[in-house]
Amino acid sequence: MHIILHQPEIPANTGNIGRTCVATGTDLHLIEPLGFQLNEKSIKRAGMDYWEHLNVTRYINFEDFKSRHPGARIWMATTKAQHVYTDVSFGPDDYIMFGKESAGIPEEILIEYSDTCIRIPMLPTI
């Protein structure tokens, strides 16, 4: 399993996701631009001392990612999806992509991947 963060903005969020990736043996893929430097204290604080064990790859944009992973099955996590993540069967080589905190995944990408858009239900207070 792979996690993709598309243009993440908050270093602590990325650090926490990175720590979870280490704990689960999941690869992390970061698509630029990032809203922070990977050497910032806040990302290291969130990732604690696990960050050095993380298998992380950076890409200059989503096209760069696609060219380096042709044929990858990418699930788009979006509040706009009809299908809930529990409705699908994930494979060990699948990717789940999350968009930037302020805006989500760009609409043009969601249109391109409309068949693999999934929603993670949230309480209405979020």
Model-derived segments and their meaning:
Residues 1-126:
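Post-transcriptional modification and biogenesis factors for structured RNAs
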